[in-house]
Amino acid sequence: MAARNCHKAVYHAIELGHLTVHYLTPPADLQFGVYGSVHPADVAAALDAEPSAKCVILTSPTYEGVLSDVRSIAEICHARGVTLLVDEAHGAHYLPLAAQYGWQGGAVAAGADLVVQSAHKTLPSLTQTAFLQLNGDLADPA
């Protein structure tokens, strides 16, 4: 299951893997001309409609800075034994900021099972520096 506003690499992986995908369509924010956040209730309804789903993929924050409620979505996924992968490419700075300012961190702290972060977008690092963080035991590291 993937949000419609995911990075094109997600769609390439779906195609290359010959996977079946069911889409989560975040509402459009017409005032700003961007997609809004993926709502937890929409994820729950989609997983209820497709109980064979193995993974939910979403982007938070989006390129435009829109955040989804990753903690609630992680709880919904985990209650059903579904892996949550969050593309947090534009949120690699959340962990250091959370530690410094004492606020909730990003998708890792919120319980996502796999989190992709692009350090070169928001942190001082070499071009193309990225992390794939494995969190919990739902995702198989192999």
Language-model features, listed with the residues they occupy:
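Conserved PLP-enzyme active-site core in the AAT-like
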Residues: 1-142
